[in-house]
Amino acid sequence: MLMSRTDSKSGKNRSGVRMFKDGDFLTPASGESWDRLRLTCSQPFTRHQSFGLAFLRVRSSLGSLADPVVDPSAPGSSGLNQNSTDVLESDPRPWLTNPSIRRTFFPDPQTSTKEISELKGMLKQLQPGPLGRAARMVLSAARKAPPASVVSPNNSHGEPGPSRAESAEPRAEEPNRKTAVGRRKRRKVQEPRRSLSNSSSQPNRRTGRTRQRQHRPQTKSDDGGVQAAGQCPICAGFFSIETLPQHAATCGESPPPQPASPASLSSSESVLRRHHVALTPVPLVPKPQPNWTEIVNKKLKFPPTLLRAIQEGQLGLVQQLLESSSDASGAGPGGPLRNVEESEDRSWREALNLAIRLGHEVITDVLLANVKFDFRQIHEALLVAVDTNQPAVVRRLLARLEREKGRKVDTKSFSLAFFDSSIDGSRFAPGVTPLTLACQKDLYEIAQLLMDQGHTIARPHPVSCACLECSNARRYDLLKFSLSRINTYRGIASRAHLSLASEDAMLAAFQLSRELRRLARKEPEFKPQYIALESLCQDYGFELLGMCRNQSEVTAVLNDLGEDSETEPEAEGLGQAFEEGIPNLARLRLAVNYNQKQFVAHPICQQVLSSIWCGNLAGWRGSTTIWKLFVAFLIFLTMPFLCIGYWLAPKSQLGRLLKIPVLKFLLHSASYLWFLIFLLGESLVMETQLSTFKGRSQSVWETSLHMIWVTGFLWFECKEVWIEGLRSYLLDWWNFLDVVILSLYLASFALRLLLAGLAYMHCRDASDSTTCRYFTTAERSEWRTEDPQFLAEVLFAVTSMLSFTRLAYILPAHESLGTLQISIGKMIDDMIRFMFILMIILTAFLCGLNNIYVPYQESEKLGNFNETFQFLFWTMFGMEEHTVVDMPQFLVPEFVGRAMYGIFTIVMVIVLLNMLIAMITNSFQKIEDDADVEWKFARSKLYLSYFREGLTLPVPFNILPSPKAAFYLVRRIFRFLCCGSSCCKAKKSDYPPIGTFTNPGARAGSAGEGERVSYRLRVIKALVQRYIETARREFEETRRKDLGNRLTELTKTVSRLQSEVASVQKNLAAGGAPRPPDGASILSRYITRVRNSFQNLGPPTSDTPAELTMPGIVETEVSLGDGLDGTGEAGAPAPGEPGSSSSAHVLVHREQEAEGSGDLLLEGDLETKGES
């Protein structure tokens, strides 16, 4: 309570129930008397928790509110005091019923002087003499209380129920109206302050239902209507329709307060009854957010014919209906507040939506000016305006919300629509906000307009998020929660949102694509939707890169990683330096790590990679395949001499030539081919010297010559991990194969060393012992099963096979071989998945057949687990005889065995093997359908691996310490010892400087990192702007083409109708009953039928109507009268009324406009209106 900042930091708690001391006050106020206390709360608190005044209780010698001033001689006074204390202790909000607190936080209108004088007289009767401090505070609180809070002497019970104003005789209409307005004003003042304490203290189920039953009558009396209520599916509490969304969003955030006990409430009532004062408690109903409350102003009664007037575009009728509805409802500025039913609220919403959808902007302005729509109606109207692509209407709606400063819409409140069940009937899916819809439709103008107003799309929480918002949303409606996430991601992954809401649109597309790919794995039920959005992000990055216009922009885009991705795990190792003169290409390598195949396979990226790959060898790309093979063969033969030359002089002309990526690739490939040749040589030597290798007479070095290359490979992989980083190293599956191969080689070599060591140890002391003979001269037939040489030879055989398969790493350098290599990789994945099903079925039949034939042992291939497995395995390939399962002397086991063997053959050979073939074919076809992208992506990864600085010398020459390495080591030691300043530690640029917009050819060598980053962002924004302009031009062109197609169809329709109308005209002129031709259209048949139906009504038609014989295009409306009068003439519609419901539009020819063209009567009942 009384705690300074020093005490708070040191943990000295000075709170407690005690009297104030002089040390608790400041020095100027020490020793002085005081009659009031001012409390300042400086500790932070959340808006969802009750304001911390419930713990405050002040007592003094003059009296206390907790101990009412009662005559000591009165019976039961001690009991009243005790009960009153219990009330404050058990009441969850004792400070709300405190008159002093209510006077400070909830000021009310003044009461009448007569009531105050009566209360003052009662207080003097209770306490003769001058009034005490408690009596003065009660009197002051009564002055601020509403008239209904003071109980007359005739009614001293203070029971809850209707107030004195309600029980009295009804007054005139105008005073009642003023009283209602006063109550509304008091509610407006009280609600913001009341929300500090009870905005999030939501009741539990039992308490919530009890309070709702208590509050419903009061709400009904205040509003004058029935308030619709809904049940929260989370806590099962009843709340009004408007407060339910806000409650559901924060339900369960803080523990509900405990209600006061009945005994305490009764004692409190007795105390108030003794004072003859009843303070009306404020209803603690959770107040909704201002964004979801109805705008308090005049509410019009919905006219039934308004929708028809809007549909027909009759502006005057709409204004007349709104004015008449306003007069009929009496909802002027001073009129009573009337609840609007849900159906009527929906009608107003449909009226506004219809006006927007039909494009009647003037009618929309009239509705917005005369009708006060709440946030939900404006929200749906915005969606309709965005859906119909009307930026002007969107501006009007946003301006309407902007003018309501007191109820200004918070853009975060759009998420509360999830908990609003009143908009479930909307045509828009859950989670669709105006900005989300605009982005989904790629409406750049509307999206930019909404973003300028502060609208954003909040990124959904992770799938496994267990926060209060996500848990409440799942419990409220799981389907709406899932659809809301999908629709939100549709908006985020749209081209408009990526272009307008991201500073680096390309990087945002990469990161979002990776996130959507992960969500597709975590939420397989929505995998197709996530995969489609991920493909959309890849296409956006591909198209954005295509907006580059010069090499400077390409260099700026591909060479910078981006500040937002520097902390990403996939960006590890992307800051490494490349060879001298080779740009960093950090953005391109990030795209490779993010698996952006479309972006990497873009012609711009491939051109950059190909130019770096060839280096100064300009003629390499245009040379023939024979010449390339000849150069590769020369490098293969001279590989040792080239490596020695580079080792001696790395900065010479030969050294710079070997640093070119394509030559480095050929050099390393030649080294690996030499390694495979040595492996083949060792195998051939073992065949020629079989007697030597059959026993233990060979030495370790004779069988381990390949370990020279293995040592070089091990050092190469260590340097690669050091340069790239462990995570980036493990992202490549070929590195896993390298680790396995090296591990097996080292294990084989270690076993041979172990064998040699054991032979030396056992033969050192006793050379003629049995153990020494076993490890030196024993024959192979005498070796034990776990002999080290057995294991070493087996491991070496497996490793040799894997070493040859490692040669497939260089196949992506060729287009045809690279595509086959990718297809084989996909097929291996299919086979691994297929093996799970295969092993399940094979194990099932293995157990069944083995259990049948074990007791009989009639066959060598059945009855034993290992033999049965081999028999079934080779049966899949048709290499076993079916007579093996025969047992003539045992009919029942033989029948079951044959049946099981037949079923196994059908399932494995016919079903599963064909299914495997279909899977492999499908994978191969997928690669072939996108072979160009797949091959270019694989080739790009191969190219990038040879762009790095270092690793120029191939295996095994890289294990030799080079003079360059020694020079770098000495220079690093010298810098560490002699130059420890920060200037020496400054990192150089990883790529050459780039030009600027003003001078693309200039070298920005002196430009800082900030200028380079700024230039990159300017390039990205320029690309985005070009992309937006291109999208707009394509949209306009598509719309023009669509309009042209419609005009062409309209022209054909007019030509066809011309002939039909001419035929009708000829028949009418002949005066007979025309018969429609067989090929006549529906319109022609309809006109003919109308003429035949009314041929005997009205005056005759002239033989040659002037308007039908004039060529030209005119739109004619043919309508039937709604009824006939007594004379047989068609009844004309009254002015202002809509036309007939049955109408048809006919296009006829006209040569020139007829002045004052009016209605053309056909047979008196066929009415045509011509418009030029």
From Swiss-Prot:
Intervals, Cytoplasmic compartment: 1-659, 724-738, 811-833, 921-1172
Major subcellular location class: membrane
Membrane topology, as annotated: Multi-pass membrane protein
GO molecular function list: calmodulin binding; damaged DNA binding; diacylglycerol binding; inositol 1,4,5 trisphosphate binding; store-operated calcium channel activity
Residue ranges with Basic residues bias: 206-218
ANK repeat start-end pairs: 301-330, 377-406, 430-459
GO biological processes: acrosome reaction; aggressive behavior; calcium ion transport; female courtship behavior; inter-male aggressive behavior; mating behavior, sex discrimination; negative regulation of male mating behavior; positive regulation of cytosolic calcium ion concentration
InterPro entries cross-referenced by the UniProt entry: Ankyrin_rpt-contain_sf, Galactose-bd-like_sf, Ion_trans_dom, TRP_dom, TRPC2_channel, TRPC_channel, Xrcc1_N
Gene3D superfamilies according to UniProt: Ankyrin repeat-containing domain, Galactose-binding domain-like
Polar residues compositional bias, start-end: 75-87, 195-204
Signal peptide region: none
Residues that span the membrane, as ranges: 660-680, 703-723, 739-759, 790-810, 834-854, 900-920
Keywords, alphabetical: ANK repeat, Calcium, Calcium channel, Calcium transport, Ion channel, Ion transport, Membrane, Repeat, Transmembrane, Transmembrane helix, Transport
Cellular component, GO, one term: plasma membrane
Compositional bias ranges of the Basic and acidic residues kind: 1-10, 166-177
Expression across tissues: Isoform 3 is ubiquitously expressed at low levels. Isoform 4 is expressed exclusively in vomeronasal organ.
Extracellular side: 681-702, 760-789, 855-899
Effects seen without this gene: Reduced electrophysiological response to pheromone mixtures in the vomeronasal organ. Mutant males and nursing females are docile and fail to initiate aggressive attacks on intruder males. Males display normal mating behavior towards females but display increased sexual behavior towards prepubescent females even when presented simultaneously with adult estrus females and also show increased sexual behavior towards juvenile and adult males. Lack of response to Esp1.
UniProt biased composition (Low complexity): 261-270, 1130-1144
Ranges for region Disordered: 1-22, 69-98, 140-227, 249-271, 1118-1172
Stated family: Belongs to the transient receptor (TC 1.A.4) family. STrpC subfamily. TRPC2 sub-subfamily.
Job of this protein: Thought to form a receptor-activated non-selective calcium permeant cation channel. Probably is operated by a phosphatidylinositol second messenger system activated by receptor tyrosine kinases or G-protein coupled receptors. May also be activated by intracellular calcium store depletion. Plays a role in mediating responsivity to pheromones that elicit aggressive and mating behaviors. Required for response to the Esp1 pheromone which enhances female sexual receptive behavior and to the Esp22 pheromone which inhibits adult male mating behavior.
Full protein name: Short transient receptor potential channel 2
